[in-house]
Amino acid sequence: DMTIHDFDMARYITGSEVVEVFAKGAVRVDAAIGAAGDIDTAVIVLIHQSGAITTIGNSRKAAYGYDQRVEAFGSLGMAASDNTHQFNSTLATDTGYRRPPLENFFLERYNRSYLDQWAAFVDMVTNDGPSPASGAHGRAPLVIATAALKSMRENRPVRITEVDAAIEGNVES
């Protein structure tokens, strides 16, 4: 549940579908999560149709606040999106660097994105325009998540084709 949006972002950023997944997970933070049959720490490698490789590191806890960053590396350079801090300031002294804490709640971190999505939705409904997302866009991360869970349980890479047909229903684009 904590990585589904990362799967969606990987497809969007690379512009390529995922063809294979390898996932490892552990309980490293909260034993109660393990007792409930879940994990709190995961590392996932996605292989894309284009040959691009995505690595995702995920944990339910970062001691310094909610940490969500993305970096894309390629032959022409790198693009990155860093964490959002409560204030955009840094103090540098002879003892090192200090910054305000990271934004903690998702509404604070993604306020601008939610407003943009609502505006696009209202525009689509008002002007009877096409949806920028299809059922297939929603289904793809679910298929990747299913492959990741199978990979983690079986300790092996899993091809998307192994789980795609097993997911009930066929969502058309």
How would you name each of these model-derived features?
Residues T55-N58, S81-N83:
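Beta-strand scaffold of nucleotide-dependent catalytic cores
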Residues V70, Q86-R98:
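Short polybasic amphipathic segments
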Residues Q49, D123-S173:
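C-terminal helix-rich "cap/oligomerization" subdomain common to oxidoreductases
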Residues E17, S50-A52, S75-M78, G129, ...:
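Short acidic/polar mixed-charge low-complexity motifs
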Residues Y64-Y66, F73, D82-N83, D116:
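C-terminal substrate-binding/catalytic lobe of Rossmann-fold NAD(P)-dependent oxidoreductases
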Residues A63, F106-W118:
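Active-site loop of classical SDR/Rossmann-like NAD(P)-dependent oxidoreductases
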Residues D1-I53, S59-Y64, A136:
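Rossmann-like dinucleotide-binding domain that binds NAD(P)(H)
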Residues D6-F7, L115-A119, A145:
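A general structural signal for well-ordered alpha-helical segments in protein cores
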